[in-house]
């Protein structure tokens, strides 16, 4: 594969199927012809430039669909498992589910020192959901996107270069940061629930610097607020970017192998895929454990 075509191949696989709003007067080249929009229009982006011009209020349809679909599959699997649960010794899939639940329950008991019925189910959902999203990285990079491309070209008249379709939600920072900022809101909620609004404000305004002198204490409040607000925001940012960075790097290696080796990509991809099984499991575990630790810190009494 030539360098230019390899570069285009990689760029195409890193793009998302994007839905957003283009402004009035925007000149777009889509489906083989050019047009000028007479009014602001919500539409699918035909290329990376359009996706960029849609701005922040655009939706990555593929990431949302796959993350939502995998979440539904996860809930369905556990629902079916719960229906078949009996008082006897579990076997097969039920045994697997029981192992996961006991493993996560142990992690929660070891890491969370408060009292909340929310943490264990939340941890189970986070681990299984993130694991399923990461697991999509093991599917050959061209298998589903090429199928989607064929459908859109054959039945909807799209050009092949317009059919962006990513299937690994955790390689999209919008998904990982969305999950991690949800964790931040839970941190705030549990802090207020445990310590009250005054206690929450106190954790931001009265730490880490303290003083018995009222004047000095008042002078330290802006500094404490700045430091603690940064620390609060750093938790979800680092949590989301850690997952995104590791999964994006793994996906990029698969794309590079496919671009360089073509139909022989499976030879090079197999060793990396075997190693990547550890990565996808470890990243789901780390995301879950850090969530438990952050929530435990939120309910600790100082």
UniProtKB/Swiss-Prot annotation:
Q: How does it sit in the membrane?
A: Multi-pass membrane protein
Give the primary localization class: membrane
Gene Ontology CC annotation, any one: proton-transporting ATP synthase complex
Q: Which GO biological process entries does UniProt record here?
A: proton motive force-driven plasma membrane ATP synthesis
HAMAP family linked to this entry: ATP_synth_a_bact (MF_01393)
Function, as annotated: Key component of the proton channel; it plays a direct role in the translocation of protons across the membrane.
> What family classification does the UniProt entry report for this protein?
Belongs to the ATPase A chain family.
Q: How does it assemble?
A: F-type ATPases have 2 components, CF(1) - the catalytic core - and CF(0) - the membrane proton channel. CF(1) has five subunits: alpha(3), beta(3), gamma(1), delta(1), epsilon(1). CF(0) has three main subunits: a(1), b(2) and c(9-12). The alpha and beta chains form an alternating ring which encloses part of the gamma chain. CF(1) is attached to CF(0) by a central stalk formed by the gamma and epsilon chains, while a peripheral stalk is formed by the delta and b chains.
Name of the protein described by the UniProt record: ATP synthase subunit a
